[in-house]
Amino acid sequence: MNNIEKAKECLKNGASLVLYDGKEFIEENGKGLSPLLKLLSEKNDLSRFCAADKIIGKAAAMLFALLKIKNVYGEVLSRKAIPILEKYGIKYSFGTVTDSIKNRYGTGICPMEQTVEGIDDADTALKAIKEKIKTMRMNNMKKLGFGRSEESVV
């Protein structure tokens, strides 16, 4: 069994992202892009690893490029991720291919996919993704009643 097959096998144990280099496994759990963003923030050299992920859309493909991962498997892979993976020389395989990645509620397109829609550069994509996450967090805080101006507080 090769490295990507072993990483794929570990996805069945419940991890959302598994990296494997033939000796070491790195398993991450989390929703959306958070496992990839965590790995990026740690600034470790992961270029010798392959990766298996539950869902790989264009945004995730950009982050895999920044991590310098050379081989990925996605249980679900979006068609929009394929040109990015090819551009950065990342081999890919998948369980299912889809036209688009849906948001976690299944009501529309994933906001991260929308964020990178017109972007083809991984560094630019990372900046846009971080800004989108910041905006989404601020909007969620406002919905919870935080972040109101002093004038609106009685």
Language model features: what each stretch is:
Residues 1-75, 95-97, 102-112:
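Conserved mixed alpha/beta catalytic, RNA-binding, or beta-rich assembly cores of soluble enzyme
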Residues 76-80:
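Short, polar loop motifs at secondary-structure junctions
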